[in-house]
Amino acid sequence: MENDAGENVDLYVPRKCSASNRIIHAKDHASVQLSIVDVDPETGRQTDGSKTYAICGEIRRMGESDDCIVRLAKKDGLITKNF
């Protein structure tokens, strides 16, 4: 919901599963969120860029979370296409 100034005033903004696009409910204690950061190859330090993936508990229960993370990382260019 937005106020008159166009600012977001919701107290709770639900997350969506990156793999299935389902809403992750507040009581889904099996869900995980992974943040993968960009690293400078020379210094080994974190740069400003990062990518966040949220996986719902239903995907994890089926045992498909590793395949989903690899598919999403390939799509974003974090992993080579022939991995």
From Swiss-Prot:
Gene3D superfamilies reported for this sequence: 3.30.1230.20
Main location: cytoplasm
rRNA processing is among the record's keywords: yes
Domain of life of the organism encoding this protein: Eukaryota
Subcellular location: Cytoplasm, Cytosol; Cytoplasm; Rough endoplasmic reticulum
Keywords: Cytoplasm, Developmental protein, Endoplasmic reticulum, Ribonucleoprotein, Ribosomal protein, rRNA processing, Translation regulation
GO cellular component: cytosolic ribosome; ribonucleoprotein complex; ribosome; rough endoplasmic reticulum
Any GO molecular function: structural constituent of ribosome
Signal peptide: none
A single BP term in Gene Ontology: translation
PANTHER family documented for this protein: 40S RIBOSOMAL PROTEIN S21 (PTHR10442)
Assembly notes: Component of the 40S small ribosomal subunit. Interacts with sta.
Family note: Belongs to the eukaryotic ribosomal protein eS21 family.
Function: May be an associated component of the ribosome rather than a core structural subunit. May act as a translation initiation factor. Has a role in regulation of cell proliferation in the hematopoietic organs and the imaginal disks of larva.
Name of the protein: Small ribosomal subunit protein eS21
Organism this protein belongs to: Drosophila ananassae
